[in-house]
Each structure stands twice: as structure tokens, then as C-alpha cells.
């Protein structure tokens, strides 16, 4: 049976759920797909289909990023169910980097937890400018307690530059909505309306040279190697030539799909799978970049403005100095780098500093690009590239 082609009839946005483990992100994602499926604009994806890796089912946590799609009256969304567990924040960094907006899920029973704050900080660092809050499990909570949690969340968002007073906060129950309770399915509608109206259509750089950071690599027997990810900028069509930076390969795109539907052309903001001609599976990996030929020159050295997380925000307890060698999470790549603080010499937790970084390998860099700094499984800093050195 031939696949139905993807037809672009509505503007496309990338949205995601984030928040602390067990606050109900995946349940809420399933509830959104169920409510919209009943409206006739999507396919219901049950909870156990979203949380799909075996180790997740055992531990009840989302590790790999799961994508679902749905439509509201005015938009088409690709929805990323974001990891909630601290060990997996590195996935969050690569997942959040391609989001146009996010739904912050906070349990009305528990309030703000450590990962709630870390996810908000990361969202800010990787350029997610608009957040809508879902106060989940609102069916089980005391109203006054829920009011306090809402206040707490607004203060957290304000502290991270999100204008907490104007952020929509919607009280929901993912579980009750899945059970079909009309009060709570209406709350899901209200949440989606808030996303539709509060998260603006981003400026898409469709005319810039094509660039896609590789999130995943698959092999289709008899057809070749497939890379998946979100198009950062530009447009790509079947038959276009591309460079795979990191693999040092030039090739041709022989197939293009989004959510299993073939498409003629993908553009900035689309989540896509690209079939690459004659590229061995082991030549390409997550962190590589697929780009228009000759459009990007990878570099190792750059200068950046970096915020070193305070101890209270889960950062280091001691300062960093020149010679520090953490992991730099840049787009979907993670690379070790040497830090030179110049005359500053040391940076204490809570400081914002300028640093020069020498990476362990060449990475496509450009001014304005955001990144996270991690060590020992936690985020310790976040910054923006200011200049790239040859």
C-alpha cells in the first residue's frame, strides 16, 4: 500500500513537554493525542507507545526522545516528549534545541522539584522563548495548594526571564482526560488553545543554506542509511547534494519523509528523515551535521559568553579555572573542550564570564549558537558563541 504524502496545509511548529520525573509529561502527551483524535485531527498514541524503550518501562522514566504529531484548528505540531530524569538531560539539550515552545508540566501535588528548575534553565539557554504551564494532577489537589504551586511556578519563570506574570497556566489532569472525563478533556482543549495563541510562529530561515543536526541514524535494508533530525535552516529536496560534516562525505538525498509520510521538500522547522545515497551506516552518527555543500566550515576554537550555574541551581560548588575540560553540548554533538578564561583566570558558580574554548574535534560553529556545559551527568554552565576562530 503506497504511503500518503505529507501535505503542508497549516503552519508547522515544534513543541515539547518538559518537567520533573513522574509529574505526568508522558500521560499528558497521550491525553493530548486522545482528545485531538476524538476531534478528528490526529491519531491517539497511548502512554505505553510513547514510553517505548524497555529500560524506561522498568524504571518508569522517559529516556529517548519520543515524537508524536497532531493538529489543532490552526497549526500542525510535532510534539517531543522530553526526558524527565536528571541522567538524561543531555537528550533534553538536543531535544530542546529544536523547540519553538514548550509545555512545562508541574504536578499540582508536588510543586517545583530540582529537574523542573533545571529544565527551565536549559530551555532558556537553548533558545526556547515561550513556555506554557500545565499544572497536572489538578483533580487530586487542594485548590489553595494548587494556587501556591502556580505562584511558585510563575516566580521560577520570571527568575529565568520568561515573564511569569503573563505565561498561561492551565490546570489539567492527563489521567482524567485519558479516562474521558469531560471537565478534564476541556482542560486539554484550553491548554492547546493557550499554546496556539501564546507561542508565536517563529521566523523560519527557509532561504538560508540547508543545515540539519543529526539526531539519529537508521538503516533501511536495501535502501541505505537514513538520518533524522529537525531542519535548522534552509530547504531540502529529493535529489539535492549535501555534505555530511563529521563524516567527510558528500552525497545525494534520495528520499525524504516526515512522520512516515513521503515529502517532496522539507524546510526549516520540519522533523525529517533523509535517505542518503551510498553512505555506510557506521560513517554517520548523532552529532554530525548535514548541510548544503560548502556552506559550513567546521572549527575547533571559539569565544563565548558563559553563565556558570550557581550551586543552588544544581551547578558546581567550586570555581572553574583555565585548563578546565568539561563536555560541550553543541546542537546534537557532545565534545570535550579546553577552557581558557584569559585574564579572568577563575569563574565562580553564579558568574557570567567570557571564555575561549578549544574543542577536541571540528564542529560547525557560528556566532549566536547556544550550548550547554556538562560534567559528571549534570549541567554546570550554558553559553552563547560570540566569535569563531579559524
UniProtKB/Swiss-Prot annotation:
Residues 10-203 form the tr-type G domain. Residues 173-175 are annotated as: G5. Residues 81-84 are annotated as: G3. GTP binds at residues 19-26, 81-85, 136-139. Its EC number is 3.6.5.3. Residues 19-26 are annotated as: G1. It catalyses: GTP + H2O = GDP + phosphate + H(+). PROSITE patterns: G_TR_1, G_TR_2. Residues 60-64 are annotated as: G2. CDD domains: EF_Tu (cd01884), EFTU_III (cd03707). GO terms for molecular function: GTP binding; GTPase activity; translation elongation factor activity. Keywords: Cytoplasm, Elongation factor, GTP-binding, Hydrolase, Magnesium, Metal-binding, Nucleotide-binding, Protein biosynthesis. GO terms for cellular component: cytosol. Monomer. GTP hydrolase that promotes the GTP-dependent binding of aminoacyl-tRNA to the A-site of ribosomes during protein biosynthesis. This is Elongation factor Tu 2. It comes from Streptomyces avermitilis (strain ATCC 31267 / DSM 46492 / JCM 5070 / NBRC 14893 / NCIMB 12804 / NRRL 8165 / MA-4680).
